[in-house]
Every structure is written in C-alpha cells, then in structure tokens.
Amino acid sequence: MTTPPSTPGGGAALPDGSASIHELLDVEILEAGPERVVMRLPVDWKVHQPYGILHGGVSALLAESAASFGAALAAEPGRSVVGIELNASHLRSVRDGHLTADATPVRVGRTIQVWRISLTDDEGRAICEARCTLSVLGAPGGASGAVHPPSPAPVTE
C-alpha cells in the first residue's frame, strides 16, 4: 500500500501536498495505488442536502476524487490526468456514518483512463455506482512528479 500525502491537519491532500476540498470534508485515503484507491469521508451535516441525507454531489466528488488519485498514480511519470466524464447512479440514501469509495481501473490507456467506483456505507451496502473517464495530459516521459497541467504563460504584447 502506498502512503498518500497528507496536510498538516492530517486530512487528505492532493498528490503535490496542497490542501483541498478533501481536507474540508475530512476525506481519508485508506489505500492508494495504480490498481486500487479506497477513500472515505464522514457523512454528517456538512455533506447533507436539505432533507438531511447525503448530497448526491458529494458522492460524485468522492467518486471522481478516488478515480483521479488512482489515474494519476497509473499515468506515466510527467503526465497528469483530468476528469472528462462522470456517470453516477445513486442507489440508496445515507444519513450518517461514512461513505467509502473503492476505485479500480477498467482501462488504463496512454491518453484515456476509465475507472469504476463503488461507494458503500458502513454496513457495506451499495450507495452509488460510478464510472469516471479521465484524459491523460502531457508528453510521455516528461518531468517526473507533474500532477497538474502547467499554468498558461502570461500574455505579453
């Protein structure tokens, strides 16, 4: 198992170590590798929709996050990945406990990756099934450690 980076507060971090929405939602990375990523977040008032149940967008966020972490680890050094499509089927609601995402690759290609993500509650019941397609950016064999595409150069006249 690969030990994922963390922020000073102990929350999850992006592969470059920066804090993100993952820290705000107390996402934990339980396992991270190019063949499988398992992430978990607590279900509480922060992630509820107005009816007191888990907001579907949070399921989508966790699904794409797990797929993105795995895809970044599966990509060649120097390449980065970005989500280009996410399909999520919400199967049942959750009021409290934890939501766990288990992401595995369906296809890891040179320019496209597809990941399947199963989200479950603390009892192992299916909450959401998702599929995420990611585009692999950058030239093969580029600088090691790139996670995000480079910022555009400033426009000069």
What feature does the model see in each segment?
Residues 1-157:
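Terminal targeting signals and extreme-terminal segments of soluble enzymes
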